[in-house]
């Protein structure tokens, strides 16, 4: 496993774990209705934003359009169904015909725990972790959901769309010069 791949895996896990640490008891009453009029009857997750199928949130066609590269394979994995206060998650891994890779991780929380404290904690944790690999700081990105930040060098964009939804776009094979703009364009498709 390359150093870059290990860094991406470490940051993805760190961000998801840190994002789960917010305390939001009592916020779940209407949280599952954000973004959709109909919701999954068992979990409350919006039917139009199924976090357990990240490949449906950003499709292969949308990925190909933004990346200007044909997607040869898209695979969903790391699926976790919502259960009580535990979030629903998944990851879609896209492989391009040219050998490039990208991934999209999605998260929906039944308790609306994407509060300022959880987001700040996740960002601080990522910033501390990334210092081991680069001297470039984590960058805030405005105009995307409730909060967003970009991790240079590994080309990862973390977007907290609202109190219940989060998307993490990682474009490890994209050139550093275009990766941030491409990740932002992909995140907009998840909104």
List where the protein language model places each region.
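A short, solvent-exposed beta-edge/loop patch
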Residues: 40-51, 55-56, 64-65, 134-191
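Sec-dependent bacterial lipoprotein signal peptides
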Residues: 1-18
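Short, solvent-exposed recognition patches
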Residues: 70-144
């Amino acid at each position: 496993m390359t150093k870059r791949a290990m860094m991406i895996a470490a940051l993805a896990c760190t961000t998801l774990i840190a994002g789960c640490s917010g305390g939001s008891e009592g916020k779940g009453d209407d949280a599952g209705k954000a973004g959709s009029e109909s919701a999954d009857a068992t979990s409350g997750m919006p039917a139009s934003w199924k976090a357990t199928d990240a490949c449906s949130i950003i499709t292969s066609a949308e990925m190909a359009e933004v990346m200007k590269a044909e997607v040869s394979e898209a695979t969903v994995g790391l699926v976790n169904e919502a259960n009580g206060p535990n979030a629903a998650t998944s990851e879609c891994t896209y492989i391009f015909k040219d050998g490039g890779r990208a991934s999209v991780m999605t998260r929906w929380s039944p308790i609306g725990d994407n509060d300022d404290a959880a987001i700040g904690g996740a960002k601080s944790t990522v910033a501390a972790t990334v210092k081991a690999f680069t001297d470039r700081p984590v960058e805030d990105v405005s105009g995307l959901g409730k909060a967003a930040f970009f991790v240079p060098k590994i080309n990862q964009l973390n977007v907290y769309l609202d109190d219940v939804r989060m998307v993490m776009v990682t474009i490890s094979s994209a050139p550093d010069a275009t990766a941030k703009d491409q990740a932002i364009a992909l995140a907009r498709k998840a909104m």
